């Protein structure tokens, strides 16, 4: 154990002697007895074998699902072994962009490569070094769009409910009005959405694919946003961008995304990764760190933190954001994942997810009472009706090692006479979802055998 201790017993005795004390108790005698912690009731140490057994017993108490059919913003995807190998290197194991950053050229280059790949994936001009998660990235994007004349925010109800609540939380303290437009048929109600845009609207947020997996008519929505003089923010699924049109191609001003799908495990909800990228016109409003490429005094390529005048350590309370410490290690994982997969690998993952989700939907619709909630194109998530209690089905499948889709509740479409401000909506439940429905998901991790097994279990329960 000597190598794990800062000093030996002999060194401690020498230090006490130099200070004129005979023991450690004499050293702390000046501390009142009532303020001392006393003896700590800690168990005795364990051998490595005993520790392995104890941790193994604790881990065995976890519920581990053989197959997962739940997404709703967090996805079980394949992670190449190289990702964990790279982020486990001691040179990288920190969440910080280092102080005296230019000394750490390797860290800066890894962030620069991440930024470059994010820009290539999203079709945007500039990316930062990452944010905390997709929801906070959306909130930061809203603040990028604020000015003296425009501050209002319009959000489609088909955006992830957690993102909507995060945006509302960020905006509340600044007195920024957030208007959520109810869905129609599981997608954005385009006429209502366009009607909500006005001279005071700073930005509008849409999601592609949306929370229910449906592919929005994004081009028309973005055109309506720009026609009103507002900025368009798109929350994108990064893996789906392997086959879908990029936000840049669609004319988006700011793209945000949850980067968990890019090489990060589900891991009890975090840490995840906030991706944000924008057009060059908004570059100086980007929050957080940005790494740039330049030349040193000898003419060699070098990497630096650039445009730092935006940041809180320079501008203090006038900074565009208070983000400082970031998700650098998670960004490294995402960058490594993208480098491993390449454009072709990402496209295969997206195509496989699409095909398996549609196969799952086809099989589920064979069961009486299970129907697609909406007749609309979807990516790798979809909602179905459920004839009985979804919570009971969830428990039944969990006992067999299968995590089914997320139970969701019905909020009537605005067009059908329902209120967009019902109690269910106020509780953060998604608008326009089917009564007693289930939001299913499939990725490249779901085999045909797993899908068939899950469908048979649902059939067995539904009899």
Enumerate the language-model features and the residues they cover:
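N-terminal entrance/gating region of PLP-dependent enzymes' catalytic architecture
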Residues: 37-113
């Amino acid at each position: 154990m000597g190598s794990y201790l800062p000093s030996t017993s002999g060194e401690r005795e020498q230090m006490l002697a130099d200070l004129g004390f005979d023991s450690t108790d004499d050293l702390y005698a000046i501390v009142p007895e009532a303020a001392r912690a006393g003896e700590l009731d800690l168990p005795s140490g364990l051998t490595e074998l005993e520790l392995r057994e104890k941790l193994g017993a604790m881990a065995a108490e976890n519920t581990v699902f053989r197959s997962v059919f739940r997404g709703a913003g967090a996805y079980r995807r394949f992670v190449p072994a190289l990702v964990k190998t790279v982020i486990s290197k001691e040179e990288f194991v920190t969440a910080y962009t280092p102080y005296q950053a230019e000394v750490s050229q390797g860290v800066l280059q890894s962030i620069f490569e991440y930024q470059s790949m994010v820009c290539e994936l999203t079709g945007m001009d500039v990316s930062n070094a990452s944010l905390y998660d997709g929801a906070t990235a959306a909130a930061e994007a809203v603040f990028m769009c604020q000015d003296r004349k425009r501050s209002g925010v319009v959000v489609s109800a088909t955006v992830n409910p957690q993102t909507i609540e995060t945006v509302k939380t960020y905006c509340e303290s600044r007195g920024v009005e957030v208007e959520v437009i109810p869905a129609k048929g599981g997608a954005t109600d385009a006429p209502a959405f366009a009607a909500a845009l006005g001279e005071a609207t700073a930005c509008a947020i849409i999601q592609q694919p949306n929370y229910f997996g449906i592919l929005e008519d994004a081009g028309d929505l973005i055109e309506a946003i720009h026609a009103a003089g507002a900025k368009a923010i798109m929350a994108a699924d990064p893996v789906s961008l392997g086959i879908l049109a990029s936000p840049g191609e669609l004319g988006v001003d700011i793209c945000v995304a949850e980067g968990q799908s890019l090489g990060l495990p589900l891991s009890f909800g975090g840490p995840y990764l906030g991706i944000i990228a924008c057009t060059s016109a908004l570059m100086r409003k980007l929050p957080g760190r940005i790494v740039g490429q330049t030349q040193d005094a000898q003419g060699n390529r070098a990497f630096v933190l650039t445009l730092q005048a935006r940041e809180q350590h320079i501008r203090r309370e006038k900074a565009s954001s208070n983000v400082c410490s970031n998700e650098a290690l998670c960004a490294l994982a995402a960058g490594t994942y993208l480098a491993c997969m390449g454009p072709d690998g990402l496209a295969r993952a997206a195509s496989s997810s699409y095909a398996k989700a549609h196969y799952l939907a086809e099989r589920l619709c064979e069961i009486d009472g299970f129907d697609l909630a909406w007749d609309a194109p979807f990516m790798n998530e979809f909602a179905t009706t459920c004839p009985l209690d979804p919570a009971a089905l969830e428990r039944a499948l969990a006992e067999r090692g299968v995590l089914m889709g997320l139970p969701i509740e019905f909020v009537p479409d605005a067009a059908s006479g329902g209120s967009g401000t019902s109690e269910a909506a106020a509780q953060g439940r998604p608008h326009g979802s089917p009564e007693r429905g289930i939001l299913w998901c499939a990725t490249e991790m779901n085999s045909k055998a797993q899908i068939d097994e899950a469908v048979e279990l649902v059939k067995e329960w539904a009899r």
